[in-house]
Amino acid sequence: MAYKIRKINRNVERRDYTKVSMNLSLPNLIGIQTETFEWFKTKGIQEVLDEFFPILSFDGSSVLTLENWGFKEPRLSVRQAKEESKIYDAPIYANLKLSVNKTEEIQKEFDGVVLDDALQILSKWLEEKTVSKNITFKQQSQNSYFFELTIKKSEKPDLIQIDIIEDKKTSLICNVSIYKSGEVFLGDFPLMTEAGTFIINGSQKVIVSQLVRSPGAYFNKELNRKTGEMIYFADIIPSRGTWLEYETDSKKIGNDAINPLYVKIDKSRKTTATSLLLAFGISKDDILNIFDNDEVLVETLQQDSIIGDFKIDWSNQVQEIYKKITQGETATSEGASKFINSILFDKRKYDLTKAGRFKLKQKLSIKNRILNRVIAEDIVDANNNVLIAKDTEVNKHNIKQISEILDQDVMSIDLNYLSDIPGTRKVQKIKVYKDSELKTDTTCLIGLTSSSNEEFITVADILSTVSYLLNLKYNIGEIDDIDNLGNRRVRTVGELLQNQFRMGLNRIDKNVKEKLATSDLYKVKTSTIINAKPLTAIIGEFFNLSQLSQFMDQINPLSELTNKRRLTALGSGGLSRDRAGLEVRDVHPSHYGRICPIETPEGPNIGLINNLSTYARVNEYGFITTPYRKVINGIIQNDQVEYLTADQEKNFIIAQSNVNQDENGKILDEIIVSRFNGDDYMAKVEEIDYIDVSPKQIVSVATSGIPFLENDDANRALMGANMQRQAVPLIKPESPIVATGIEFEAARDSGEAIVAKEDAIVKYVDSKTIITDGESGIRTYILSDYERSNNGTSLTQSPIVKVGDVVKKGEIIADGPSMDQGELAIGQNVVVAFSTYNGYNFEDAIVMSERIVIDDRFTSTHIDEYTLEVRNTKQGQEEVIREIPNMSEQAKRHLDAEGIVAIGTEVKVGDVLVGKVTPKGQVQLSPEDKLLHAIFGEKSRNVKDNSLRVPNGGEGIVQSIKRFKAKSALNPDGIELPADIIEVIKVYVVQKRKIQEGDKMSGRHGNKGIISRILPVEDMPHLEDGTPVDIILNPQGVPSRMNIGQILEIHLGMAAKKLNQKVITPAFEGLNEKELEEIMAEAGMTNYGKVTLIDGQTGEPFDKPIAVGVMYMLKLSHMVDDKIHARNVGPYSLITQQPLGGKAQNGGQRFGEMEVWALEAYGAAHTLREILTIKSDDIKGRSKTYEAIVRSKKIPEPGIPESFNVLSKEIMGLGFNMYMIDETGEKSVINAYDKKNFDADNYEDDEILVKTDTLYIDDEDVDAEFEDLTYVDENDILRSFESENDIDEEE
């Protein structure tokens, strides 16, 4: 038996055809969000605060220290934040201590009286200084006096210590120390929900992780085409700060070719690398000693003007470098040296980050450069004991032992350079042979010691980089591939927020220093020293405007999960899609098990937006790791799972997971297809170091949801993975018969299901709540019911447990949308036949049975939110009211007494949802008007109807209404609203959309199509046993697309349906051909799954057998109701006066260049003329045409289109005069309006002519032509031929 029965949960069992035993369980799929935010809260904020505190004043007399900090309770719950359109956040408070230390001369005379008691003098002086009488003397110890100053009873008193240094005749010289402490508000910080999202202004947002180039040292080489010499490059790239770029050069001096080494500091002009070392205070002799007189450095030193006097040489080099960095400015040698040191060695200006230091140590330490090299000297410890003998070859077997010896920092030398440069002053130095075979010439390797941990660059780093670069020509070390995932790291949510927090604190730091310098520190309070606004502003800007803060894709649970696991190379500090080449978008060998090679967008972002693979994790340095099992002597160690980065797996041979093995994990094959350094490798069993944990570890969650993925072409698999995210939740979700086994984990971690937080017993269940009793006591889970998602789909949760059930932690107890019994269910299992049908499935179109529509198989619900704000205007308050002037009772039929639509009402386009009137500008009323107003009330009031109406396509049933009133003295229970808003009313209208012609559907294999015909059940073909076919697909859609997975799926689906079983067939390790044949035979299927179909219309069988089976089909969120659109009267573009385009603008259809050619080709001159004039931008013509149609007159001759007028004005704007000449030779100005034949009196009041003044040049002749035309400001442009009310609305 090739399968086992697997229990998914208490309700679902499946036949599991998984081949690889001991499958590692999936990690928390949204851990990349939740775990890193938790790190930010506990450690990330602390790290930033440690960088800035204590804050010293400019003169050093006062210091602000941080004692502790913490989050307070959130002001709103997640549910409240969503309902009230607020931010789900919590305030951060810090306890700060301000210490001030000053020397003061205190006069003994007060109010003309000289005091001689020190305590009296000090008390009087303090009262004057602090302008306070609340000073209490506490104690005296010799010449030290201690006081307390109470500012507020609720706050801690200030402590003041005064030490008398000298008692003069008229004054006391004292040292005054003041200690103030208090709690300070640092701002509100958005919190992450349990689902890994942020609630910003009521909407769920996701911070997408960013894939960027890691800080570190990078090496490259290229051939100089002129000289034929190889040029070597090295870059040291920090996260923030100055770049150092090294390059070798080939020059000719006389007949000698020399290869000096140059460096560019922050993209400045290049200077020799040795001059930089000299500027650090390393002498010429030391440079040559460190590098054993390397010929490149000897030649480079010859380029420097060195006279042999260390001080003069140092001064010259420092000033020369300063001049190049600052583009010609000069400075003293001390000033220049200070400047160079500050841009390279100051932690505040130069930040390598932990990841950068990790990469530098990995790249520049000697142990990582000597594999397959022969050591040319004895390696000894401090006592000259030989640890590694000369002529030892370093290979795969002894590298670990040698690395451990080198980690003890043996063979290190001390560096001698300027004392004010910080950092490790040691490097490791070992000689190896340039050629391991000949063993003649040696070269020295300079590398970092294990004690290098600084997060800024050090002189040791620079020397090691130079050494690495010099040794590349002997093939010691390797050049870097920038697209390798070992050189790209992920900035997760936690790090991105930490960077924003750092920027905010940087601004606060500057403000605090200024305040300490300018304030009277005797009177200042700690609570007022810090203003949190800069921090709050930066955080708000990041969440609202950053490219990485995205409105969550919430069509279904899978799209939500994918959004949280997304990696983007775009955004600030990343790439831009215009400049990104093909290489960076391509699939790289290091993506294996880390980034999905399939799932990526199809448009301009292809390859720049990726998804994490199923088992991938991000380590503490931001590098993506993937798990492997250790293999020792051909035996798989199932209990030893190691997560490796792309760099770590480089020198290991890794086998695929589907090898043949016995029950003890012994590999049975002798030769195994493996990977080594990114290439395929046929390895012997004893060579294997690691083995994959699962065949699906290379793909993402969405991709691993495709059964028979291995039988699909990659292009179609990409479409399949992307379209699963677009499937709308259906009202009767159905889990797939043919699943891949990831459906449970995807549903559990999506954030839409309700998951048990602990082991417990279910005590109570209904449609709104589940109550459990566990270790922590009674716990209540609230279920959402018809909530609107970000994408307008409905979020409804339904319980799948009953009272008395024992639930385990992590078990799904209530399904979310698109879930069935705790499994992801984004579509329906339908009977599919691959056959043509009267041409109705031409070009991927789909023929469907009416039975599916009647049974509501693909019916979905969609919720629209309509918001009305009641404002306080300058003319008076707006009112929500039923009695709206000039509105019929028929129009108000759905409104209650308050003027708000009743819940449950079915509303159509144009119906009033909320009645609202806005006062117009009130004039001073006469006594008669006041009397009329008193008698007739609303009727005579000067108000405008501003009611909320159902827009086009918005019809449905009113599902709920939410009212939020502003907080005030009269309404203390209200919510915080902007100043001029009195009330917000939200009306939710739900639509039930059945599937119809024009809707887009797809399978999971990229087989997408539009429904072209829905046939009555009796006309659909059926099987011989009477089973009707639900969907007919075109068989021509399969061969060229090469997505054969869909054919295997229908056969397996049909067999499983007949056996009344559900199956699991995971990607790359599911059913094989033999097993498929077995299950089909078990189900009694013959002839390779092909059957005789009967034509429903004639009752005759089709000529040939047809492939019929069960396929999982999805209804996508591209529905015809959202797309179809027609324009009657609508807006025009301001300048060209042509109709706008697109449904959102109520635009027309574009009649473009090629369509004009088509009419020209037909010779349809009259049609062409009216399309280009009166139907488009002939302003006068279209108004006259409208008038002619309304009054049944003859349609007038077209005039000049406005676009021609625009062209002529643009040409005039260039300084060319343009005019028309008639047959008599008379010149006339080009005018869009024919003034002679145009009489404005013929126009009705509502036909307003508009002419913009933006395009006219200042020319008297032109002005004269237009002098009696009315000009209107751009903002007041009114459309012609609209009713008075419409014009009023649009104004």
UniProtKB/Swiss-Prot annotation:
Recorded GO MF terms: DNA binding; DNA-directed RNA polymerase activity; ribonucleoside binding
CDD domains named among the record's database cross-references: RNA_pol_B_RPB2 (cd00653)
Gene3D superfamilies: 2.40.50.100, 2.40.50.150, 3.90.1100.10, DNA-directed RNA polymerase, beta subunit, external 1 domain, DNA-directed RNA polymerase, subunit 2, domain 6, RNA polymerase alpha subunit dimerisation domain, RNA polymerase Rpb2, domain 2
EC code(s) of this entry: 2.7.7.6
CC per GO annotation: DNA-directed RNA polymerase complex
Family according to the record: Belongs to the RNA polymerase beta chain family.
HAMAP family given in the database record: RNApol_bact_RpoB
Name listed for the protein in its UniProt record: DNA-directed RNA polymerase subunit beta
